[in-house]
Amino acid sequence: QMLDSMIHNPRPTRAEVADVANAIYDGTDCIMLSGETAAGKYPVEAVRMMASIAEDTERYLTKSRDYHDRGGIKNVNSAIGAAAVEISNRVDATCIICPTHSGRTARLISNFRPKLPIYAMSPSNHAIRKTCFQWGVRAYKTTEQGSLSATCYNALTVAKEHGLVKTGDLVVITAGDPQTSPSQGDYITSTNMTMVSQIQ
């Protein structure tokens, strides 16, 4: 309970504010309240306070280069993720689209805290639920496709249908190619492809 004192008081303690801010500093994707809103006297104030602390902390952090590099480049997957974020900045892309079976690609991109929205496109309800808690990611349901090109085309179609992109927009697509990725069962386990596409 990060703002525990707000169960009974309209303002948190300084230590509680520091706890929330430190969670953001540490790269936490999601923070939540429990007793403060379930049984507290000031549930609305608690939500506003937590949101305010998170927004102020992120606003401060985004000025630091380390904030966007926090994902770290440890392997090919993370190198592709870092490259996708860098490319999206350089080409002034509208968003980053991640066709994914497991949600791993979207999580990988999220680690680098891009300035653009990340759209996870998955046929898996499980993956969609998981990505809801990842920083900066919004998930949408797609249909199962056989090839990488069909998967990417389908993801762009879903993005257009939801009004996420429009004709002429540049988008960065990052995914795993099942032809060249090591796989485990039906799940692609390696992110190894990034491309830029213009919406037609």
Where do the PLM segments sit?
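Long, charged amphipathic helices and adjacent flexible linkers at domain junctions
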Residues: 49-85, 193
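Glycine-rich phosphate-binding active-site loops on the catalytic face of alpha/beta enzymes
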Residues: 20-43
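Flexible glycine/proline-rich, aromatic-decorated loop/lid segments
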Residues: 6-28, 53
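Conserved, mostly hydrophobic/aromatic
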Residues: 1, 23, 109, 171
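Beta-strand/loop-dominated core regions that host nucleotide or nucleotide-derived cofactor-binding catalytic loops
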Residues: 138-141, 153, 157, 182-200
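Flexible, glycine/charged-enriched surface loops at secondary-structure junctions
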Residues: 34, 59-70, 94, 165-170
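C-terminal helical cap(s) of enzyme catalytic domains, especially alpha/beta-barrels
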Residues: 37-59, 185-196
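Nucleotide-binding motor/catalytic cores of P-loop/tubulin-like NTPases across gene-expression machines
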Residues: 105-107, 113-150
